Amino acid sequence: MTDPALSPAANATRAASAAPGKYLTITLGRESYGIPVLKVREIIRLCPITRVANMPPHVRGVINLRGKVIPVVDLRTRFGVPAGADHDRTCIVVAQVTAPAGGSPRPYGVIVDAVEEVATFAAADIQPAPDFGGAIDTRFLTGMAHQGAAVKTLIDLDAIAAAEIPLAASSAFPGS
């Protein structure tokens, strides 16, 4: 059976969801990406992360942020970007993701190499993500945005969270 999330129609829908507006631009390796700024709750320094057994390598574990347990995914590893050693600009972007199947929004942390800036992209700046032939999982992208001569890949954190943290995990972390 074919995964409907990988269909051309699903890709077109995701590209249409790359709304014009403000994006927090981040770096993973040498590449630049964008996260909708309205999803971002805060940016924190990299802190100790508690590993969770039987998780894939890109799920680094959980952190305790003011009494809430928050799952943390290393976006570098998730996107196949060679992850060098963590450094002074490596940080965790804490975002509010929408749970699948109409669940309540919850906090979700992603490790990034650096935060660049907040950029504004007009509708004309955003195009659908091209088909990379399986090299990149486009389910996690909402589009590509032009910024001068550069191109920023726009990330769908809701899709990443839905793929990484199963619904059962949300009940394991009440109040998160």
Language model: regions and residue ranges:
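An acidic, low-aromatic, low-complexity terminal/linker signal
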Residues: 1-176
